[in-house]
């Protein structure tokens, strides 16, 4: 399953968040594969697309950053998967 993680650096935490990222590289825990990560230039927001079947790995990853970032993780599907769902629902 794929999850889109979005984050915003908590107010007053930009420097510690940046230092933590530089120190660790923000690796994902076992059971979670990083597909891509993007940072909005000049802002405190970013996104990461991860894949894994173990929801506890996702919980672990977000918990590791929860003191510095406001985080949301959303399950996402690709176009072909969405098309299959729409075909079932709307008979296409």
Write out the residue ranges for each language-model feature.
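Conserved, structured core segments of small domains
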Residues: 1-92
């Amino acid at each position: 399953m794929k999850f889109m993680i979005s984050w915003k650096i908590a107010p007053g935490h930009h420097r510690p968040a940046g230092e933590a990222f530089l120190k660790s590289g923000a690796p994902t825990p076992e059971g979670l594969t990083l597909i891509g990560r993007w940072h909005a230039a000049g802002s405190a927001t970013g996104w990461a697309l991860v894949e894994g079947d173990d929801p506890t790995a996702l919980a672990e990853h977000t918990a590791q950053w929860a003191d510095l970032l406001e985080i949301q993780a959303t399950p996402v599907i690709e176009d072909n998967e969405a098309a299959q769902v729409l075909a079932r629902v709307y008979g296409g």
